[in-house]
Amino acid sequence: MNLIPTVIEQTNRGERAYDIYSRLLKDRIIMLGSAIDDNVANSIVSQLLFLESQDPDKDIHLYINSPGGSITAGMAIYDTMQFIKPQVSTICIGMAASMGAFLLAAGEKGKRYALPNSEVMIHQPLGGAQGQATEIEIAAKRILFLREKLNQILADRTGQPLEVLQRDTDRDNFMTAEKALEYGLIDKIFTNR
């Protein structure tokens, strides 16, 4: 069951009810609180574009609590974050794993945060293939290409050498907020506002 809270706001015209996500969007806050698939990515991209159209000079805040998900869907969010004019700050609440960690690191440098008990996990892309040998070979080449591409972007975003990223993403690599800060995935740990 997916319950979405509703909030009531008093205005000079009376009361207005919002679902919580729409109300947060008014404050330029976007929640990524699920696995990343095409539907989630389309929703996040749409919100980023909408907020840019509202005010291209005001920051957008992307809160992340995600186990990761589709690389192509995540790259749509990443590319949009880099494309739009407003700076996007990222805040890890709970867990930013896999593509969630990638998007956390994709925030504006100096504006990537985590709460103290958050966890971040990086690893190499996951995939599978079936079919004829040539189809399996094509899929394997693609996933190796994606691994190198993601590692290079993470190296650029964190300041870590590419060789370190290749080693550290070989297996699931879980980090506390403190370790993510040392690693360069985030810039600060928030303890209060």
Swiss-Prot record:
Keywords (A to Z) from UniProt: Cytoplasm, Hydrolase, Protease, Serine protease
Cellular component terms (Gene Ontology): cytoplasm; endopeptidase Clp complex
Reactions performed catalytically: Hydrolysis of proteins to small peptides in the presence of ATP and magnesium. alpha-casein is the usual test substrate. In the absence of ATP, only oligopeptides shorter than five residues are hydrolyzed (such as succinyl-Leu-Tyr-|-NHMec, and Leu-Tyr-Leu-|-Tyr-Trp, in which cleavage of the -Tyr-|-Leu- and -Tyr-|-Trp bonds also occurs)
One Gene Ontology term from the biological process aspect of the record: protein quality control for misfolded or incompletely synthesized proteins
Active-site residues, as the UniProt record annotates them: S98, H123
Pfam families the record matches: CLP_protease
Keyword Cytoplasm belongs to the record: yes
The enzyme's E.C. designation: 3.4.21.92
Highest taxon in the source lineage: Bacteria
MF terms in GO: ATP-dependent peptidase activity; ATPase binding; serine-type endopeptidase activity
Presence of keyword Cytoplasm: yes
Cellular localisation: Cytoplasm
Coiled-coil regions, chain positions: none
Top class in the EC scheme: hydrolase
Subunit structure: Fourteen ClpP subunits assemble into 2 heptameric rings which stack back to back to give a disk-like structure with a central cavity, resembling the structure of eukaryotic proteasomes.
Function: Cleaves peptides in various proteins in a process that requires ATP hydrolysis. Has a chymotrypsin-like activity. Plays a major role in the degradation of misfolded proteins.
Family: Belongs to the peptidase S14 family.
Protein name per the record: ATP-dependent Clp protease proteolytic subunit 2
